């Protein structure tokens, strides 16, 4: 069976408030088929990472972070400091030691 996949997730711009004020966390993802046996993918993608975050780290108001199977509009996603749109968004296949940042660009007044 495959080993765990270690990635670092970071939250900023207020998104950290949805994750118990955690700004940075290194996580060891289990083999994908262990976490999601029915997944069509063989390897972790950002889509599965969002499910894992929802199930394991998200503690406040899911609707402020997720919409359907993606992040809510107004959440900027960076993969190793580059816009996720350059990497296929939800289809990006996670690699060991990737750094995934979620930044809220919406602020109340």
UniProtKB/Swiss-Prot annotation:
PANTHER family: RURM1 PROTEIN (PTHR14986). One of its GO terms (cellular component) is cytosol. The lineage of its organism: Eukaryota, Metazoa, Ecdysozoa, Arthropoda, Hexapoda. Keywords: Cytoplasm, Isopeptide bond, tRNA processing, Ubl conjugation pathway. Its main location: cytoplasm. GO terms for biological process: protein urmylation; tRNA thio-modification; tRNA wobble uridine modification. It is found in: Cytoplasm. It holds the Pfam family Urm1. This is Ubiquitin-related modifier 1 homolog. The keyword Transmembrane helix does not apply. It comes from the Eukaryota. HAMAP family: Urm1 (MF_03048). InterPro entries: Beta-grasp_dom_sf (IPR012675), Mopterin_synth/thiamin_S_b (IPR016155), Urm1 (IPR015221). It comes from Bombyx mori (Silk moth). C-terminal thiocarboxylation occurs in 2 steps, it is first acyl-adenylated (-COAMP) via the hesA/moeB/thiF part of the MOCS3 homolog, then thiocarboxylated (-COSH) via the rhodanese domain of the MOCS3 homolog.
